[in-house]
């Protein structure tokens, strides 16, 4: 299930931007330019996880 990504300030749907970042693997810089509102740009820059290779397990620090 895919949850929608919505800007909490203005209510704009940002799911298309997440698709372009994660599926099409576009650069964040190119996607952010398409949004004129600063609140949407901030949301995209801080709330979307970078693309990860999920086949590699992270090493755990036990200390």
From Swiss-Prot:
Its EC number is 2.7.7.6. Induction: Expressed in the early phase of the viral replicative cycle. It is an enzyme of class 2 (transferase). One of its GO terms (biological process) is DNA-templated transcription. One of its GO terms (cellular component) is virion component. It is found in: Virion. Belongs to the poxviridae DNA-directed RNA polymerase 7 kDa subunit family. Part of the DNA-dependent RNA polymerase which catalyzes the transcription of viral DNA into RNA using the four ribonucleoside triphosphates as substrates. Responsible for the transcription of early, intermediate and late genes. DNA-dependent RNA polymerase associates with the early transcription factor (ETF) thereby allowing the early genes transcription. Late transcription, and probably also intermediate transcription, require newly synthesized RNA polymerase. This is DNA-directed RNA polymerase 7 kDa subunit.
């Amino acid at each position: 299930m895919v949850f929608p990504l919505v800007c909490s300030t203005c209510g704009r749907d940002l799911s298309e931007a997440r698709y372009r970042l994660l599926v099409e693997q576009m650069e964040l810089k190119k996607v952010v330019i398409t949004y004129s509102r600063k609140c949407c740009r901030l949301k995209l820059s801080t709330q979307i996880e970078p693309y990860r290779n999920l086949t590699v397990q992270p090493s755990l620090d036990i200390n």
